[in-house]
Amino acid sequence: RDFPFTGPYPEAVRDYKEAARMAIYYIHRMPAIQSWKTQTVPDMSYDHNTYPCKIIGATIRNEVLVAKEFPLLADEAIAIAKNAATFLIDMSRPEDAPLAFFPPTYYLNYVNSKRDWNQGKTMTLEACAAGHAFLDLYDYTGEQLYYDRAVGIADTYLKLQGEDGSYPIKVDFVTGEPVNDVKAMLHPLLNYMQRLRSQYGLTK
């Protein structure tokens, strides 16, 4: 089929990097992000914070980028990132639990977190998002706590892997038992483990 696009096209207003810088700055200035400067719990007026691994993990990663791209905002951005990371750590399963070091997929009763089938459950591979966030924060701050959390998540994944190499897509957040027979797509975990291997030399 022919592509439906036809020129001529207007010139770009700005290049990709500048557009990306504007985007991360916009996110940084959002009230729900700014609230992390003084809080270690999410502002639930932004109800997507109901997904800690995905959204709060992304908040941490965004703020590390802000610190790199806007040096005058670095202290503020890293304060936000650290408080968001504190929340993820506080919400994570303890070290002796089946899902040790995993933050939850769902938090409180907003959007899909309120569904009966999601209460007390977690999407197995979402902890990778939190792991990447901890690694980004470690890279910037050099604080061992964040690296150790990321490695702890990886260690738990090794324990969860089935004999056939698969992972359940969704498990009980306390027991770690699968809630159905569906298996997860593994690319988030492969990317996470590859980062640990290539960037930090971690092989397990």
Say what each PLM segment does.
Residues 51, 118, 122-125, 142, ...:
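Structural signature of alpha-solenoid helical repeat scaffolds
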Residues 108-117, 171-176:
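Acidic/His metal-coordination segments adjacent to aromatic residues that form catalytic metal sites
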Residues 143, 150-167, 171-204:
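Solenoidal tandem-repeat scaffolds enriched in leucines and small polar residues
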Residues 46-47, 118, 177-178:
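Short, recurring structural edge motifs at helix starts
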